């Protein structure tokens, strides 16, 4: 695997025969091709891009790079210049980077990896960097683009050619920084090959995606690849996480030229969180760092968000921004959409919409809300589990809900191609006395809002910012935030 842009001879990619590429866009989806664009055709996760060469040519492709596996042959009827490259599936990002002129070399690219927290941290880094004088682009789950103007996306980390095209466009639009969520799928499928990462954050490693990775060991090994990236200058690691603490030790041994910064509540952390306080108004903490000590108070909720703030402080200070200014701008940041998103109406329950879809994330979200729950009030949890994903996670989610909430409503998430009732039945053994079982998620949300007391807190977990529900392969319009708003309006 080639993680970082290297000379052509070292990557094994031959000298590119694509002339006059400057200004052209590359795409691996033939439907995006416009007159003069370049098509990159290689086998993908679900389809073989080489099957779509005729469509790309019909749409105006001026050049085609294609995966030369020794079996596929170029059809002379496709009368456009072309070049076959071996193992293009894993080299597409490097190829695109070279065609675009290595644009990520001219950006401060910050990567964020880990099971939970990637979206919040990338969006906070973008907001903070903008306030510090940068122009920061975002690549991640909620969308790609600039803060306040994100375009929806289907993948946390896009396809390799799309990643490079995004970076090229961002640079054209004046970006100086790119904050990127780096998923385990993205690392495993070579989607970020060719990206010059300057700094990287590791948030945590908890159970997720085992339907894909198989074991936690394999999952962790893939996550750690980002921190061995050629040219990486700073690694920022959560040492409150067991895997993170181990990773710090390995990196200090294996990468003597890498600046490694640990963060967390641990007394051994380089960026240590102390004097933490939490209320319904937000959190505050003192951060002891190699650059000095300071306090930050924000409207964010949760102990885990203090850890996320520490990660941001470490990365920003490592990149040369003064600690006092970093703390000042972080106090002004807004939560990412669907991440501990509070909907408050006077005389009605506080409803919090969060993307928590792993046992660890659900446990932490509920613990946060228990801390701020009024005396005598109840904490509700409305959640489900995604279909066609790790079945072993379902009872663990149920157990986390029972442990952390006073009242549990079990419902659907994105059932995908599974029967919603089958998914619920996998959850229920861990939820012996649910308040309600309702497969219709909208009805489940309305039930909780209608039945909760005025001083109760309701966590709607799992979908966060998503504006759809995937049922039998069809994405129907659905938003937890919208359903909650409507339910609060009609509550008597």
Curated annotation (Swiss-Prot):
Described function: Catalyzes the addition of meso-diaminopimelic acid to the nucleotide precursor UDP-N-acetylmuramoyl-L-alanyl-D-glutamate (UMAG) in the biosynthesis of bacterial cell-wall peptidoglycan.
N6-carboxylysine: modified positions: 223
Intracellular or extracellular location(s): Cytoplasm
Binding residues annotated for meso-2,6-diaminopimelate, in chain numbering: 389, 413-416, 462, 466
Cellular component, GO annotation: cytoplasm
Assigned protein family: Belongs to the MurCDEF family. MurE subfamily.
PTMs per UniProt: Carboxylation is probably crucial for Mg(2+) binding and, consequently, for the gamma-phosphate positioning of ATP.
Primary enzyme class: ligase
Keywords noted in UniProt: ATP-binding, Cell cycle, Cell division, Cell shape, Cell wall biogenesis/degradation, Cytoplasm, Ligase, Magnesium, Nucleotide-binding, Peptidoglycan synthesis
A GO MF term: magnesium ion binding
Pathway: Cell wall biogenesis; peptidoglycan biosynthesis
The protein's name: UDP-N-acetylmuramoyl-L-alanyl-D-glutamate--2,6-diaminopimelate ligase
Transmembrane spans: none
Reactions catalysed according to its record: UDP-N-acetyl-alpha-D-muramoyl-L-alanyl-D-glutamate + meso-2,6-diaminopimelate + ATP = UDP-N-acetyl-alpha-D-muramoyl-L-alanyl-gamma-D-glutamyl-meso-2,6-diaminopimelate + ADP + phosphate + H(+)
Binding sites annotated in the UniProt record for ATP: 114-120
GO BP term, pick one: cell division
Primary site of residence: cytoplasm
């Amino acid at each position: 695997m080639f993680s970082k842009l290297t000379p052509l001879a070292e990557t094994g990619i031959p000298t590119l025969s694509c002339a006059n590429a400057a200004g052209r866009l590359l795409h691996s989806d033939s439907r995006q091709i416009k007159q003069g664009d370049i098509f990159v055709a290689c086998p993908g996760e679900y389809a073989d891009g080489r099957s779509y060469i005729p469509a790309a040519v019909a749409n105006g492709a001026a050049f085609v790079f294609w995966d030369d596996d020794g079996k596929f042959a170029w059809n002379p009827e496709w009368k456009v210049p072309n070049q076959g490259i071996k193992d293009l599936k894993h080299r597409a990002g490097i190829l695109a980077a070279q065609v675009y002129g290595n644009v990520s070399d001219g950006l401060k690219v910050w990567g964020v990896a880990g099971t939970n927290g990637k979206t919040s941290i990338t969006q906070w880094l973008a907001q903070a960097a903008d306030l510090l004088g940068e122009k920061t682009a975002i690549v991640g789950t909620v969308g790609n683009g600039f803060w306040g103007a994100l375009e929806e996306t289907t993948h946390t980390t896009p396809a390799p050619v799309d990643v490079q095209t995004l970076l090229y466009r961002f640079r054209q639009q004046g970006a100086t920084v790119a904050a990127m969520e780096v998923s385990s799928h993205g690392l495993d499928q070579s989607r970020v090959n060719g990206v010059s990462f300057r700094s990287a954050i590791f948030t945590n490693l908890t159970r997720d995606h085992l339907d894909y990775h198989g074991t936690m060991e394999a999952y962790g090994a893939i996550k750690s690849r980002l921190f061995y990236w050629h040219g990486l200058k700073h690694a920022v690691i959560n040492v409150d996480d067991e895997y993170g603490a181990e990773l710090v030790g390995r990196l200090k041994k294996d990468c003597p030229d890498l600046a490694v910064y640990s963060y967390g509540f641990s007394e051994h952390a380089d960026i240590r969180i102390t004097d933490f306080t939490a209320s319904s108004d937000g959190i505050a903490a003192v951060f002891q760092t190699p650059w000095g000590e300071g306090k930050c108070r924000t409207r964010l909720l949760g102990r885990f968000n203090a850890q996320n703030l520490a990660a941001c402080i470490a990365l920003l200070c490592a990149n040369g921004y003064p600690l006092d200014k970093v703390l000042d701008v972080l106090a002004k940041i807004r939560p990412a959409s669907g991440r501990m998103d509070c909907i408050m109406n006077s005389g009605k329950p506080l409803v919090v919409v969060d993307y928590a879809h792993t046992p660890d994330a659900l446990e932490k979200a509920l613990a946060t809300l228990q801390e701020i729950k009024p005396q005598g009030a109840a904490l509700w949890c409305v959640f489900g589990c995604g279909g066609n994903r790790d079945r072993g996670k379902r009872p663990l989610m149920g157990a986390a809900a029972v442990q952390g909430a006073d009242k549990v409503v079990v419902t659907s998430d994105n059932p995908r191609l599974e029967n919603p009732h089958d998914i619920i039945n996998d959850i229920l053994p861990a939820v012996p006395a649910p308040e309600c079982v309702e497969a219709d998620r909208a009805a489940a949300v309305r039930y909780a809002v209608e039945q909760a007391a005025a001083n109760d807190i309701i966590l709607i977990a799992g979908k966060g910012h998503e504006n759809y529900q995937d049922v039998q392969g069809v994405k129907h319009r659905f938003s937890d935030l919208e359903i909650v708003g409507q339910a609060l309006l009609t509550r008597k």
